[in-house]
């Protein structure tokens, strides 16, 4: 499965769970955020990783990647007129076995 298919599956999964998708592939000078969503008044910045289940794709989300997502998220926040309670960073792993959603990733 390619990255585009993985992001589409992740978007469908989030919508099914009640998330409202605000943007996909949001690009900044700091990097790209795969999915930006709203859930229960919070902004959720989602990194999507795909691959096989033998090598867990989520392990490719390291400290540097999270920092880049935080910088890109701050860029989005500075440029949005939406109000929100707060934000978090999630990781969604898409493999042939299914989808795993890791919420509120911390560094």
Swiss-Prot record:
One Pfam family, short name: UPF0102
SUPFAM superfamilies on file: Restriction endonuclease-like
Entry-linked Gene3D superfamilies: 3.40.1350.10
InterPro entries cross-referenced by the UniProt entry: Restrct_endonuc-II-like, tRNA_endonuc-like_dom_sf, UPF0102_YraN-like
Single GO molecular function: nucleic acid binding
Recorded superkingdom: Bacteria
NCBIfam families: PRK14677.1 (NF011270)
PANTHER family reported in the protein's UniProt record: UPF0102 PROTEIN YRAN
Protein family: Belongs to the UPF0102 family.
Name assigned to this protein: UPF0102 protein Tlet_0667
Species this protein is from: Pseudothermotoga lettingae (strain ATCC BAA-301 / DSM 14385 / NBRC 107922 / TMO)
């Amino acid at each position: 499965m390619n990255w585009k298919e993985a992001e589409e599956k992740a978007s469908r999964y989030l919508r099914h769970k009640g998330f409202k998708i605000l943007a996909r592939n949001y690009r900044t000078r700091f990097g790209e955020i795969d999915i930006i969503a709203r859930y229960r008044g919070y902004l959720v910045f989602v990194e999507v990783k795909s691959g096989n289940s033998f090598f867990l794709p989520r392990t490719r989300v390291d400290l540097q990647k999270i920092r880049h997502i935080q910088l890109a998220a701050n860029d989005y926040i500075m440029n949005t007129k939406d109000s929100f309670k707060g934000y978090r960073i999630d990781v969604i792993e898409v493999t042939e076995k299914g989808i795993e959603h890791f919420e509120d990733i911390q560094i």
